[in-house]
Amino acid sequence: MRLPTLARSRAKSFTMLAATSLMLAACAGEATAPVASTLRTQERTSPFVPTDAQRALVGVTDGTYSFTINPGQTQTLQLGASGLYIPAGAICDVAGSSYGMGTWNDACSPQTEPMTITAVVRNAATDHPSVEFQPALRFSPSKQVWLYMAVTNQATLDATKVLWYCNDTECLDESTTDGDLKSYVDTKNFMVFRRIKHFSGYVVAEFSTRPLSLDVGLDLGF
């Protein structure tokens, strides 16, 4: 299948990040007290839970999902076992709204025309699933858009997991600068989820006090 240009450029980086994030848990235990990391993510029941049939397909659900939506209507988009909730009127006008760091909380006019959303899912059958959305857009700060990522490796899902935002060079825990964006884990239903304010890339990985580099040639500091 053909991936969007930005998705193709990051495909290898997301795969590498999933592997290196395993180092994070071990090294975090050496550098910090275990209690601090386990308190990082709050446990909460996910309002979105995939069916057993949807979970059974995990492993074949990596790939590209495309949806043509009416932004004036509330949407719940199924991404294999994961999901995205977009309330009516949440999408900022794609052509006229600002986009980028520092703009996520700016007011905006809503998108009114139907549009196509593309989501590229990778590593769905692991405990480090990722998704990348196109086009680049942001959501009205007065609306709450939620991303729910299913984690299939049940043995490793705990309160150290964070849903990171990834740009072209690194992944960031956005909750350090915006309390609205803190992650939650549902260890019973094996979900990691949080509110998001823009379309970019997102990946589930262990908590770290530093950004995660997408360039495996850099010192990740784990």
Please tell me what each predicted stretch does.
Residues 2-16:
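Bacterial N-terminal signal peptides that target proteins for export
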Residues 24-26:
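C-terminal motif of bacterial Sec signal peptides marking the signal peptidase cleavage site
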Residues 28-31:
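Bacterial signal peptide processing site
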Residues 37-75, 106-172, 209:
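Proteolytic processing hotspots in large secreted/extracellular or virion-associated proteins
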Residues 71-115:
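Predominantly extracellular/luminal regions of secreted and cell-surface proteins
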Residues 169-182:
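Surface-exposed loop/edge segments in extracytoplasmic proteins
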Residues 191-214:
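C-terminal beta-strand-rich structural cap/linker in extracellular carbohydrate-active enzymes
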Residues 220-222:
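Short, solvent-exposed mixed-charge patches
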